[in-house]
Amino acid sequence: PVMNLELEQAHLLALLGLGGDQPATYRFQGAPGDQALQMLHDRLDQPLSEPMQALCDALSWLRDHTTLVPVGMCIGPFSLMTKLVSDPITPIALAGMGLSAAEDEGIAAVTDNLALAVAVITRYVEAQAAAGARAIVLCEPAANVVYLSPKQIEQGSGIFDTFVMEPLLRVKHALMGADADLILHDCGELTDGMVASLASLDPAVLSLGSSRVLWEDARLVPNTTVLFGNLPSKRFFSDAEITVEQVEDMGAELLARMRQVGHPFVLGSECDVLSVPGCEH
């Protein structure tokens, strides 16, 4: 599938009559509240946006005319929430200190936007599965140590479970109900505990960023989950950052190390390969 993680945000806002012609820059001022949540649920059965429907149509064509395995794509709930809130970091930190949504409007905004995100993402992945997707690539790059304090988590805070895992579980259950596998991608910087938590979702494939050492992460991930990655594609834009020879050496080492630990593995990039406009010329 084409990687466009702005589709869900645009569709969500359109269903609520918000965002205008620049949905990518729209941010809620305060918590959307129960009225917005109810409005979204009432309108979820409306047709998907044209780009979302086009992806579903492509999946159906693959199912009906090829022997390829159709795979869909969507953004993760936490990552979508961070695109809807002006400052998600402070409320999450306050929640990590023990405050609740009833005590802080910022936490309420994060909580409400997560609920909106789960609703529209669940609708989208179910539509993709109905169109023929056998698996969904769910991209959750914002679930990382920038947004979620490792120190707070180490001290017993449940912020990773509350804001990342619980929404992901709801999407995972929707995929299970639709008989579609989860391919989970998170290229953010993660702790061992975060990796283990993500692996507990039992994804068919877990794709991680180049900050992780995959042959060490193999001990955190069940053998039923294929590890994917994690060549540093964010540095591929310039030979001054990394050369072709260095990438080849990294790939060879990854293959050798993963064979040694015996974990199912697919060599690939940590994320999408950045494109420089005009490079095709």
Residue ranges and their predicted role:
Residues 14-17, 87, 151-153, 199-201, ...:
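Short low-complexity, flexible loop/linker segments enriched in glycine and/or proline
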Residues 95-108, 112-144, 154-155, 161, ...:
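Alpha/beta enzyme core
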Residues 1-3, 70-73, 131-140, 181-187, ...:
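Short beta-strand segments at enzyme active-site cores
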Residues 4-6, 28-29, 74-89, 134, ...:
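Short glycine-enriched loops at secondary-structure junctions
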Residues 18-127, 155-159:
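Active-site-proximal, glycine-rich beta->alpha crossover segments in alpha/beta enzymes
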